[in-house]
């Protein structure tokens, strides 16, 4: 099996006698085992008279089997042992994947095997789970991506299974009794959930021989009982579905145009990747490229090329454009320019050096990846086994060892107006149809022949050039020797207004690193005006630099400017060879970039649009956003920011920039593959930069103190009919003990809260809890979004649950030690990749954990907590002894709550009168 020379893991691909293909991965560094099983079946195999049945099957597999009869037994087992679990039903594949503490690997496999062998498909639970699926469907009805997807389904070949409604809801299941649905579930399960139609990946720290014995012990008994039904797929698009324009009316304020080209399947070309080559060229943002041309003319602000629907017999190639107000007026010219660029590519040909450059980039990303979490890798590999031969399972996504210039050029023949679908998405289009299920207004019409010809007769070709060679490709250099005194960051420079830290990685041994610089600016204390102008200034700066350093990003050297409560930050990460120079260049860019007139209106419009669209977010997301605003002194609501944003001018940006830079405190961390002398040198450069400006203290991030208030409530405005509620409890203090108790309490309550309020009471699809600290002060949140019940009912349900937990607390005593172990394992979990390690160390510095021992201290604190202490903590929470409580809700179509609370009508008034921790 082909693997990177830098990959220290061991792999073994086996196939059992029953046809089950298994990839075993031995990773000595992983603390959690991860497993994923994927079946070659999805909603394409739904019954024609029962859309969504495969989705229902996915849900039902978790609700009991012959060996573990209790609903959600697998989920509860995983959650209790520090893991997570999920499932996905796609078009042609369905996947089930989880992670768990390594010592429970065998028991988790036993659960998985039982789930896949003999599910119960209990009729009473089928009825309940249909309610959950219907709630899931209703939850997404205002999601523009889902609404757009449904229009796609209605404008393709109606005989192709892609056109079917894949989610399911009450309406699709209603014609059938629970018994009839059970028979349908059994039929699909027996026909498709068979070992010879499945691939499994297990990632573990155990030896490959031990893992192999584990899976063979269980899965050898799984019998293949049915021959897989052969169901040839028709074409995705009929002739009438191509050469068309589809106008779609969105809910959000967006102006997009998507050009879709219908291509054959691409998996046979995985070693030459012709579409990757075309995407690389079409998506280039440098001068001379398509996006640069569109920006100059103020037609578009963003372009992505290459994504799109993909299956075993088809591939869509999408060119996705974010248009400006001006661009909407000139859509035909935008398309004509695109075809001019295609003509340039066809005439110029694809030089071999371009493919070699992409191959070199792929090799770098393969040799030195930011390692994904094992659960994500297991899921990926369980799918890859269907896509690649065994020798290329690991390399398949990166492999470009058989370049085919001619094949790549031939793909351009599919980029013709007659083979194109134009989707125009904006609030001003005229529509004639409404898509089923999501009520998306749309229209579809053939493109007139004179327009088709016009698209090919543009005279823009001379304005374009193909991308230049990438000058940022990192050169190979030996990794720096690790100095033991720097394996944890140390402060190497400290003076008025400046603190610099430096450390070396001794674990991942990659030629990479991360630089963090955070600016705490005195000016943010002036309030929302400076906060909004700062946000726009950072966006304007990013716009300029993204184009200038586009190739650096492609070559694995990234930067991120972003605003935060105290000011703004600059982060660079990726390959270390030229990164420190890159970082100092970006600091210089902060000073020299003062003129933003060329793209001011575009960027401001995009920022305003994004803030305005926040009103359309799901109710539960809106509520959590408002809670964050309510609790944090320096945080402001999107609607308030939007009101300020629309009136900002270039002069305002210039003035705010001067204010922000006039007084600030700068703190930084350089961590990764650099020697101490490199760190001292860049620190001297940063010091020189720092001396040009005034200093100030770090900005205090205040948290509203609601512990001594009555229960407070706030009604959140939302353009969605579902009621939703979040109840937030603020802990008595931010001591290690209270943080530990809060984390443990949330972990203890999470599974029963979900099981009782979602699975049993069917209150909604979005039901859950979470540990929610604000600037290190601990808290717990409980949330429900329901399509069926008013907010007041949901509030009572949460309070009743908490009261009953206290009454029945002893039934959870037997889980206590296991739960504590799970939390401690999470706290001591090893970093998956270098960036994660750098981020953790940087957060520790920000949280004043200067010895980097917080996790160890917290683990010891948790170890010392006994069950009586968590009982007393929960009693105090329910009776609000020392706790604050906030109820935020969106009433949907129902009345406001009549709960006895201290009602907040104006957040700014509340914040101005609040005490802050």
Predicted features along the sequence, with ranges:
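Non-catalytic accessory/assembly modules
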Residues: 120-131, 138-139, 144-160, 164, ...
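Active-site-adjacent "gating/activation" loops or surface patches in catalytic cores
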Residues: 28, 253-254, 489-519, 532, ...
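A conserved hydrophobic secondary-structure block that centers on an alpha-helix together
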Residues: 179-195
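A glycine-rich, aromatic-flanked flexible loop/lid motif
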Residues: 306-313, 505-510, 559-561, 713-725, ...
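C-terminal regions of mature proteins
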Residues: 201-204, 357-506, 623-695, 699-707, ...
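Buried hydrophobic packing residues in well-ordered domains
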Residues: 19, 37, 55, 96, ...
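M16/insulysin-pitrilysin zinc metalloprotease superfamily fold
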Residues: 63-67, 99-132, 313-370, 529, ...
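M16/MPP (pitrilysin/insulinase) zinc-metallopeptidase core fold and M16-derived inactive scaffolds
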Residues: 29, 34-99, 144, 164-169, ...
